[in-house]
Amino acid sequence: MPTISIPADPASPDQGLKPFPIQLDSKDGKSGKLVKQIRIKYLTEPNSRSPPLTFINTYGFIYARDLSGGIMNEQSSGIQSGSVTACMMTLGPGPDIKNANRVLAALNGFYVKVRKTSSLKEEAVFELVNVPKLLANHALCKQGRLVCSAEKFVKNPSKMMAGQEYLYFPTFVSLTYCPSNLNYQVAKPILKIRSRFVYSIHMEIIFRLLCKPDSPLLKTYATDPEGRGCLASVWIHVCNILKNKKIKQRGVDSYFSSKAISMQLTVSIADTWGPTVIIKANGHIPKTAAPFFSKDGVACHPLQDVSPALTKSLWSVGCEITKARLILQESNISDLLKTQDLITDQIKIKKGHSHFGRSSFNPFKKAISLPNLTQLGQDDED
């Protein structure tokens, strides 16, 4: 089976996101508050006809507050010293922001009330408070609240206990400028469809997590032969293709290879709905596969929906796509158990967008405190 292998260029300045270094507002750099920071990434193309939009993603910490009440801000005495756990909150897509420097100032006074509830599994309820005008038209800000699986956005939900009020303060802001055609996610009911009349095409992406030699992540993920971190495999359901007469005439192997070549798939990663895999079909999309892509051939897959555990690892370390390949499987589970997977490497890793920048923001630290930061704690391996 022919292969196309286009490795990413690590030297390209467009392939990384600027890190969030830990900075304190004190002269000695050893105590004080964390300094709020913004990271900016441009995915817009010079000749793009799509109007630009901005994705805003925030990272920070959840604190417990004394239920006696009072006016809230980051220095309120009612907040207990030391964070409870780390959190990611994506505000989603919104209109173009002309001056990125205004975003940090706009977030002063903004915070999120966080509560736990439960249905089939633990859920987190986020209520946005004091939403700034600048961000009022971003997706989550317009809704004002969000209910989702607690494990998606909260690093360690088990640390949040009944009888406390919890507040999330964003500390690090990721601002991504991109064309509006990147605002497309595949409907979840479509991703869940299984039928004996179709084949499922999945994409396996191998990420290299750029962690330090003493990182606890090395105990969780596969060893990197190059010694640059560790490796993680993620599978994403790309699309379904219909079984037809051509398969019997040409054979499944040949048919699958021709479909992979004709679709001309590329893959990249960006910080939009959190760390997000972007798959683009630059060629012909089969009719059965059309619902999995936008009219421009784009499909965005937020990693928190696919692999929440890996997403949390990416809050604190950078990553790069080292390999991507397609897997053809029977869609029907009974048929899948009787057949072998077919694998092809007909994937291009999009040059300039195969890296997710390393961040010094580390949710695996125990004692980072926004109101009263006195020292950085030791690594928390939980």
UniProtKB/Swiss-Prot annotation:
Biological processes, Gene Ontology terms: virion assembly
Gene3D superfamilies: Viral matrix protein, C-terminal domain, Viral matrix protein, N-terminal domain
Keyword Transmembrane helix: no
Alphabetical keyword list: Viral matrix protein, Virion
Keyword Hydrolase set for record: no
Pfam families: Matrix_Paramyxo_C, Matrix_Paramyxo_N
Domain of life: Viruses
GO molecular function, one term: structural constituent of virion
Gene Ontology terms: cellular component: virion component
Record localization: Virion
Family assignment from sequence similarity: Belongs to the morbillivirus/respirovirus/rubulavirus M protein family.
Protein role: The M protein has a crucial role in virus assembly and interacts with the RNP complex as well as with the viral membrane.
Name recorded for this polypeptide: Matrix protein
